[in-house]
Amino acid sequence: MSKIAIIYFSKTDVTGQLARAIAAGVEQQGIKQQGECEILSHRIEGSEIIEGRFVNPHLMDELAECDAIIFGSPTYMGGVAAQFKAFADASSESWYHQKWANKVAAGFTSGGALNGDQSCTLQYLQTFAYQHGMMWVGLDKISNSGEQNLNRYGVQGGIVAQGGEDGQLHASDVATAEYLGKRVAALVSKLSATSAT
């Protein structure tokens, strides 16, 4: 059985909506492949940050057992939220022992503006994954692909979404997030099959 983690921070739940859509995509792909896929979805909470440091050793142990980790954060001031950065900094022991090496990684972000430098957040998430020796998965859809207009912003590195005034996501952003979940789950399945032979 494969295990895919979705680790994110969300203040207004816009990024949380993306996380749930990604989880739905992972689940749909698992059903399609008639294989079981465990999903570990963890929203970073303020109570886990003590004197500026993220503290949750149990989560770090669980992440070491995952086949893929999908990272998410809203874009604040052109980068990840401080809460996510606290989590990233706390992963240094996992980095030192390369516990996440060769795992699949992907990322997602949201912002209040059409382009509030969300690509900088994705680039940070990519660099973070590369530091851990992970394999980054982006989107393989050009902008406005298919009936659902997947990847409406044309960002290949991961999911970028803009929350509406009502706090809801555009339908194509939800569909794109589901697609990324399916894509990561399919790749994990292929890699598992390859390593089993």
Residue ranges: model-predicted function:
Residues 1-99, 159-197:
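N-terminal beta1-alpha1-beta2 submodule of the flavodoxin-like/Rossmannoid cofactor-binding fold
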